Regions:
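Short, hydrophobic-biased segments on the C-terminal half of alpha helices
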Residues: 48-49
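Short, structured secondary-structure boundary patches
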Residues: 7, 54, 64-66, 80-84
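Alpha-helical residues within the helix-turn-helix
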Residues: 35, 52-53
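Amphipathic alpha-helical dimerization/coiled-coil segments
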Residues: 2-3, 24, 74-97
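N-terminal helix-turn-helix DNA-binding core of bacterial DNA-binding proteins
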Residues: 2-43, 62-74
């Protein structure tokens, strides 16, 4: 069973959030992601592994291609909600100043 801390730790990096957002649009090969993200290939692989280990993305083989897909679409709702909360907090902080 995945615990909530593992999931939130996986979401604690902007690159992993961007990966999830990209993969929520369509299934992608890891080689395609290398062209989309301006980070080192080994760093990208590490981020993918963290998301796979957290159960947030799935890897499937299609011939020689390793395809990645968001395993739970509701995680995108969690990301959107966290973004809304962040904006709310910023507004409240600005109002107090």
């Amino acid at each position: 069973m995945r615990d909530i801390i593992t999931i939130f730790k996986a979401l604690s990096c902007k690159w992993r959030i961007k990966l999830l957002e990209e993969l929520s649009k369509e299934v992608r090969c890891s080689c395609e992601l290398e062209n989309l993200f301006p980070i080192d290939k080994s760093t990208l692989s590490r981020h993918i592994k963290i998301l796979v280990d957290a159960g947030l993305i799935e890897e499937t083989r299609n011939g020689t291609r390793k395809e990645l897909n968001v395993s739970h679409k509701k995680i995108i709702d969690v990301i959107k909600l966290a973004s809304e909360i962040t904006k709310d907090i910023e507004r409240k902080t600005l109002t107090k100043s």
